[in-house]
Amino acid sequence: MHFLDQAKIFIKSGDGGPGAVSFRREKYIEYGGPDGGNGGKGGDIVFEAVAGLNTLIDFRYTQHFKAKRGTPGAGRDRTGAGGPDLVIQVPVGTQILADDEERTLLADLTKAGERVHFLRGGDGGRGNASYKTSTNRAPRQHGPGWPGEEMWVWLRLKLLADAGLVGLPNAGKSTFINAVTNAQAKVGAYAFTTLRPQLGVVSHKGHEFVIADIPGLIEGAAEGAGVGDRFLGHIERCRVLLHLVDANDADVATSYRVVRDELEAYGADLIDKPVIVALNKIDTLDDELIAALSAELEAESGHPVMALSGASGAGIEPVLDKLLEAIGQPEPGPDADEEEKGGDWSPI
């Protein structure tokens, strides 16, 4: 499935149905008078957050959404039926933004089942019965129905994850997320192997949490360099960041600083999020070098440094313990029991 995290669509609520021009015609009633009913209301545009969707790719192929109009009124003072609401299903975490320079936030759907009645359908037109007065007892005018509302909007998907992975390209983020989940992210010995965000669910000590891997950041990413800046929005909602630094980099302190500078430049308080710093790919190093690099990285970051290897699995469980602690003990998994709560992590 292709991943798309933003789309521009046109939406229009339904027009109101026209009122009816009708006169009462019954036996023995010579002057029946007007009895045209009002038109029905047009359908609303409704956005609904749906679990199980994780991309906006469908909106690349269908960009215009129009609700149906209300039905016309009828004789015998019958009001037309209202047009059905048009429900547009989007992934949980979708924001609806105005098509202006500021991209004004109009709605934010963060829970499955959440609905927003976004555009109201037009009211139905008046039937001729409503125009009857003491001086105009047989009116023939009627209302055509009010038009619905219409606008262009942007949809932007911000994935909902408890923890976010950050780091330079080729820092081993995809290998890590594959090791602790069943995300099956693409892995390669070259930069920008990951070109779109990946989500995985970690099952650890009877609890589950979601972790997101975004494409690697390079210097100048906040200004558009590389591909990572576009996807930084996906970690805005994360409670904690796991910052992986490749132990094989020429200067681990510089590698750490480049990513932190880009987080600060991006804004959205990413720089203020709790962070766990980890030295990755330690399976190729001896203990003495690991200790030296960890000390160098700790001096630069001001945080304790954990050492791990996504490839061999060394040091992963303590990192998951720290993530679970930082997240704040999410809800137990559906199959958790008292014995499992003390068990090891496992991908699900």
From Swiss-Prot:
Its EC number is 3.6.5.-. Residues 120-145, 326-348 are annotated as: Disordered. Gene3D superfamilies: GTP1/OBG domain, P-loop containing nucleotide triphosphate hydrolases. It comes from Sphingopyxis alaskensis (strain DSM 13593 / LMG 18877 / RB2256) (Sphingomonas alaskensis). Its cofactor is Mg(2+). This is GTPase Obg. GO terms for molecular function: GTP binding; GTPase activity; magnesium ion binding. An essential GTPase which binds GTP, GDP and possibly (p)ppGpp with moderate affinity, with high nucleotide exchange rates and a fairly low GTP hydrolysis rate. Plays a role in control of the cell cycle, stress response, ribosome biogenesis and in those bacteria that undergo differentiation, in morphogenesis control.
